Amino acid sequence: IVGVQLRNLATVGGSIYSRFGFSDVLTMFLAMDCDVELYKGGILPLQEYAQRPYDRDVLVRLIVKKTPMQLYCQSVRNSQTDIPVLTCAAARMETGDYRIVIGARPLRAVRFELPAEPALAAEQLAAQFAESIKAQIVTGSNMRGSAEYRKHLAGVLTKRAVLELEQRKMQEEK
């Protein structure tokens, strides 16, 4: 977040609470199975909290459930210390289903649920998921990149993430 000096002061709770569109942290936790506890609002899924309008409630804690999954996160930046052009977090559940989260689009992060396709080879699965996300995602433009560039990156990062997670699965099976 911002520069190195401020990044060393940033907290997970602050990043989750603010729900910034460029947050790497929010993108990663949205791919996981998480809830948040709000002082007035009680416990609710992080996915629901991330879509809510801003309010003045206090974030008490982030609850990370111990759901078995493989997770892979990546981002594209114009420079190492810059905020991201696009972020991607992918989770492969034990069932083979996928949860892909795309952030810094530059809108708030969005999550896609994709069903398992056991009949497809890893390369085909990755290409299919990448095309699906490119067709569905809404991106915007700013000084870091155009909407078209971000849409293209969403497909590329999704494909890389699925290939990585499928490769991990094959290594575990050996």
Residue ranges of model-derived segments:
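C-terminal structural segment of proteins
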Residues: I1-K174
